[in-house]
Amino acid sequence: MTDSPGGVAPASPVEDASDASLGQPEEGAPCQVVLQGAELNGILQAFAPLRTSLLDSLLVMGDRGILIHNTIFGEQVFLPLEHSQFSRYRWRGPTAAFLSLVDQKRSLLSVFRANQYPDLRRVELAITGQAPFRTLVQRIWTTTSDGEAVELASETLMKRELTSFVVLVPQGTPDVQLRLTRPQLTKVLNATGADSATPTTFELGVNGKFSVFTTSTCVTFAAREEGVSSSTSTQVQILSNALTKAGQAAANAKTVYGENTHRTFSVVVDDCSMRAVLRRLQVGGGTLKFFLTTPVPSLCVTATGPNAVSAVFLLKPQKICLDWLGHSQGSPSAGSSASRASGSEPTDSQDSASDAVSHGDPEDLDGAARAGEAGALHACPMPSSTTRVTPTTKRGRSGGEDARADTALKKPKTGSPTAPPPADPVPLDTEDDSDAADGTAARPAAPDARSGSRYACYFRDLPTGEASPGAFSAFRGGPQTPYGFGFP
């Protein structure tokens, strides 16, 4: 599952005869990306809520599309643009990476800012040269008062390829995912802690209730499996009976849909940047994706709509309680204390402080007492000493830019768990096997870009000549579906 050096993405048939009047790509340019018409309007709509958040980003370009990678408040943000979203997308050669910022003022992505060019008509990216010393030239056209297309030569930007780069692309299938509408996600964000001293608990109880709470605030929803008929949903019936003064619309507002909602868990998130990141990105509705059985557990929030931006928040393994592992699917042996303390009936969207206390102290999820009460505490091993590296660039001898390490996983905060040493996580595909039940299941293999593991590391090191498969090989299918950035 590697990129084909000579692979060419099929061009979209939306080109028209006006291309000739708008200029041709540079002679011998092996790669060309064109935006105009409906495709240009779609990209402008996708960037509209992002404002200036992604102006200083890393652009990873390959035969599958463009991946925009950035860091906001220390958290990883990804925005994929598939080749079908462009009017023309032609690519030959290995994957390339470019820093979007040109001169500390202008960016390759500035053209997509709202009202930057009111009469914008066409955007073209042409990449010439030989890897890893290729050059990207961005040209734009606007429409004059006479309806003619004119190129703005003064706005032409040029950028050299990064001779070396590293980017971590999450991948894999989430253990549990829940889809929230814009009002529902807003309530969840309002319930999250604003500082590290106020941890937030995400909990999916055995009674089918999804709760997000702190010591002072709580919001709850009925979690329903995607595609289940409303006539067979007990939780919907409970909600309909409880809301005597409301109609079906009110019941739907308190119901979230997702996949694997039978997998009960409790997760304590002490990262205070979640609310700030999602508000900066202006995420409306979104999907919460919980990756809890991997060596590096995380929570991913993917926005719905045209932009499909994803933010990844890393979790502490010792603050994760998985109740469904070790039991048959859909029949966890014990629910969490928060679900049992609050009863089986979902509460209203915003509860009082006293009701939130009845859910239990989130810190209780971290101790041995909680492990004994829940029946099983399955925590993933702590990641090895990994640190977040700030992207740095320097000029190479050949004139190309060099970014040694663009990003890496952040190191968890200090602190020792009070629970017993965690056991090896049980893979989902072997959770009912006899070997897994006996605790002899093998540890998952180390992350590999081609094995469908949690993280794939893509790189090119110019001095050594080492290189990984293209950065989009993770989205080509294989044993696991993509991480959820919008690619099929």
Curated annotation (Swiss-Prot):
SUPFAM superfamilies found in the cross-reference section: DNA clamp
InterPro entries: DNA_clamp_sf (IPR046938), Herpes_UL42 (IPR003202)
Source organism, top-level taxon: Viruses
Residue interval(s) of motif Bipartite nuclear localization signal: 394-413
Recorded GO CC terms: DNA polymerase complex; host cell nucleus
UniProt keyword Transcription, yes or no: no
Region span, Disordered: 1-26, 331-453, 469-488
Biased composition, class Low complexity, residue ranges: 331-344, 368-379, 437-453
Regions of compositional bias (Polar residues) in chain numbering: 345-355, 383-393
Subcellular location: Host nucleus
GO molecular function, one term: DNA binding
Biological process per Gene Ontology, one example term: DNA replication
Signal peptide: none
Transmembrane region(s): none
Keywords: DNA replication, DNA-binding, Host nucleus
Bias-annotated ranges (Basic and acidic residues): 398-409
Keyword Ubl conjugation: no
Quaternary data: Interacts with the DNA polymerase catalytic subunit UL30. Interacts with the origin-binding protein.
Protein's job: Plays an essential role in viral DNA replication by acting as the polymerase accessory subunit. Associates with the viral polymerase to increase its processivity and forms high-affinity direct interactions with DNA. Facilitates the origin-binding protein UL9 loading onto DNA thus increasing its ability to assemble into a functional complex capable of unwinding duplex DNA.
Protein family according to the UniProt entry: Belongs to the herpesviridae DNA polymerase processivity factor family.
Protein name: DNA polymerase processivity factor
